[in-house]
Amino acid sequence: MIQDDNDVLEPPINFSTVDEGIFRSGFPQPPNFPFLKTLQLRSIIYLCPEPYPEENLEFLRSQNIQLFQFGIEGKKKASSSAASSIPKQTILEALKVLIDVRNHPVLIHCKRGKHRTGCLVGVLRKFQNWCLASVFEEYQRFAGAKSRTTDLRFIETFDVVGLRDCLYGIIHHYYRLAYYASKKRRLLLYTQAQQDMQTYRHYKP
Amino acid sequence: MIQDDNDVLEPPINFSTVDEGIFRSGFPQPPNFPFLKTLQLRSIIYLCPEPYPEENLEFLRSQNIQLFQFGIEGKKKASSSAASSIPKQTILEALKVLIDVRNHPVLIHCKRGKHRTGCLVGVLRKFQNWCLASVFEEYQRFAGAKSRTTDLRFIETFDVVGLRDCLYGIIHHYYRLAYYASKKRRLLLYTQAQQDMQTYRHYKP
């Protein structure tokens, strides 16, 4: 939380903490790298189709940060179509990476940290059981005047129940078994749980 | 992070995570209590002079949450005066409570989570060495159209260097001593450090 030297830190635009070990922002530029170092990131979820810039890749290598790229196009014709440009399956894949604590601390970003990032954080909040009014309030806080009704509809209709049930099923199953297990048996259960988590990661609604 | 039942959670208005163990919001209402429970708060920093409502006090007692109240008046004549209504000494006292990890997880709130809360979070960001542009961006994200130039000036002119130096001095002193100390001597140092932290808590610029 506290810096030891007097160098002023510059977070990326639209930076914020989402939850413990989860951050969001617009595209990080080199002047933001000293700040990003303080977060001790383990991974970055990048939501644009454009290749990651070389100097950003260099920074990731130097900090041993894993890049998860989910190429979602920025919206082209904002007013001409009522359909969302956000693909559900891609956001679901990104959500699975996002809620896996082994990837934390993680930074989600797109270009401006408003729409694509806002949609992913929105479905995370639904996964966390937030009411829709609060999810929308948060989306709008970051999108401001650029808020899109299609994004709000995307978040509203996105189904997280199946994924949550799948995850809870696995956790509950092993939690119950491990309760009565010996130390050796617990290690075996751990390996089985890892395999089940692979299934969960390939979950499709 | 995850709820185990299907009850939808309703965070207070303008709720957000500020940093690890630090949250901000507008005034929490009873429908927000189930959500607040998930944060496992140890304390609340309340920035208004009005008495805390009985049902909120009841909730705090049931959850064993400590209340720190710093009565700062809401601004009355927004446009007639260039002076800030935020008292520096009070914000400094609140900042000292806020950065003390023994009070974490902590929720900061005022009435709407915009001005008084925005000023306290603003000086925290200066304490964390954030550049002023990023501090202002964050203030404005929550204040929106209600952003006040007097608040931004308050944050800009607030001096955190003295407090930081005082805190770092204590930490550095004991860190160095404890490095070479025996277990028994370390306990003694711990007691002395606690006393020094009292001095720090009474720090006045």
Indicate where each model-derived feature is located.
Chain A
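Cys-dependent protein tyrosine phosphatase-like superfamily
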Residues: 1-108, 112, 119-205
